[in-house]
A protein has these predicted regions:
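Sec/Tat signal peptide C-region and signal peptidase I cleavage site
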Residues: 13-17
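Predominantly soluble domains enriched in secretory-pathway, periplasmic, or organellar proteins
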Residues: 18-418
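Sec-dependent N-terminal signal peptides
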Residues: 3-12
Length: 418
């Protein structure tokens, strides 16, 4: 009888304190913006075929996902109104109010391995002719697209051609500006009523890769190579002066660190406190050996690689930092049965704590603002996987996931626009 009484007393407490919903919820209203590259099937599934005759049939797409406290995910995938490439970065940009998503597309394919598709005939049109035709979407174009994330039809509100190879776009911490990295320039834009306006174009040394903006709003770390296939990818330090970006120096590896730069790197992320950057030693050319995570100390007057987490995965694709400042995660790049590395970055000895199962080729990865959820996008399986955060270092994979278009290549997170 006493046990039965205890049970009845306990049930209301659990129900009131942690009401379980039969769908994915978040502690506050948020929006996820996932982009998908139609080339992914050709690049991954048939890459060993030579000669290659796969024709590009799948349209690029994006998926908008609204999550909240009291409703199932509101999800819509739109095909054929943007172009985007899986060659490059797993993150793009969102306006600070969550109203607009921004994504780049480019014609860089790295090397022949990624360039075996037969494109539609209109791809033979010159860049100058493409710019004159404002309505056509070209797979091999250098463009930026702005998408309305709140309008239920999610129209493209603006698209512009760029005189460079725009691999990556990120929002500045000031919540107003956006920075775009090309091979030869940084571009600075401001967004007004869904349209981009260029503020500056900054000449920089040539390089192929990605970047991250320091939370101080005054510096940038990029990870770039002169030739992604044959020359090592190195981290670089930049300074933002007004709207211009100025190259400062290469970020050297301290002699005490047992690691080095390798070819085919390029992915990195700066911690929210601005003290460190996690840098992928190698993303691609899988099946060789395990790649390291290089750790840059950004508190130094001249930032330097001062630490390393050895042999994390056969290619490291993306990073996310938990709001607690103790835990970070890194996605590995196995194509089918994949891995998520959970990292302890709080101690003097950064390390891998454990691995969790992840869908193939994981790209974009983001924690929810409160840190109770982790979202991970998979191009191979067309889904956003969800992990629940239990404590400082404990993640568990949720059996529920969010369905998106095939070929996921980037994930952005922000507030729900009101």
């Amino acid at each position: 009888m006493k046990k039965l009484l205890f049970l009845f007393l306990f049930i209301p407490i659990v129900s009131a304190g942690q009401k379980l919903m039969p769908y994915i919820t978040t502690k506050s209203p948020i929006t996820l913006f996932s982009t998908q590259d139609g080339e992914t099937e050709g690049i991954w599934s048939f890459s060993v075929v030579n000669p290659y005759d796969f024709k590009l049939r799948a349209e690029d797409s994006f998926t908008v996902i609204h999550l909240g406290t009291d409703h199932p995910p509101i999800v819509k995938t739109v095909y054929g109104t943007i172009a985007t490439s899986i060659i490059g970065t797993p993150s793009m940009a969102m306006s600070s109010d969550g109203h607009y998503g921004l994504v780049t597309n480019h014609n860089w394919r790295g090397f022949d391995f990624f360039d075996k598709l037969i494109y539609p005939l209109d791809e033979s049109i010159s860049p100058e002719e493409k710019k004159l035709n404002k309505e056509t979407i070209y797979q091999l174009s250098n463009m930026i697209f702005v998408v309305d994330l709140e309008n239920s039809s999610h129209p493209v509100t603006h698209k512009i051609h760029v005189d460079d190879v725009p691999v990556h776009i990120l929002a500045h911490p000031d919540g107003k500006r956006f920075f775009v990295l090309g091979h030869n320039h940084f571009f600075t834009y401001i967004l007004k009523n869904g349209k981009l306006f260029e503020l500056a174009k900054s000449k920089i040394p040539y390089g192929q890769g990605c970047f991250w903006i320091h939370p101080n709003g005054e510096n940038i770390v990029a990870s770039r190579s002169k030739d992604w296939k044959s020359e090592v990818t190195k981290a670089e330090w930049f300074k933002i002066v007004d709207n211009k970006v100025i190259y400062k120096h290469e970020i050297e590896i301290d002699s005490s660190v047992d690691s080095n730069y390798q070819i085919m790197g390029g992915i990195l992320r700066i911690s929210p406190d601005g003290k460190k950057a996690l840098i992928s030693q190698r993303t691609y050319d899988n099946g060789i050996d395990f790649a390291d995570i290089l750790i840059a100390d950004l508190t130094l007057k001249k930032p330097k690689i001062t630490d390393v987490i050895k042999q994390v995965g056969d290619g490291i694709e993306s990073f996310a930092f938990h709001p607690n400042g103790k835990m970070a995660v890194a996605t590995c790049l196995e194509k089918r049965k994949n891995s998520l590395a959970v990292l302890d970055i709080s101690s003097d000895n950064p390390r891998v704590l454990y691995y969790l199962d992840a869908a193939g080729g994981s790209q974009g990865i983001e924690f929810s603002p409160e840190g109770d959820k982790l979202f991970l996008g998979s191009p191979a399986h067309g889904r956003i996987e969800v992990y629940d955060v239990k404590d400082d270092f404990k993640l568990s994979k949720n059996q529920k996931f969010i369905k998106i278009g095939y070929g996921h290549n980037s994930l952005s997170i922000g507030p729900r626009y009101r």
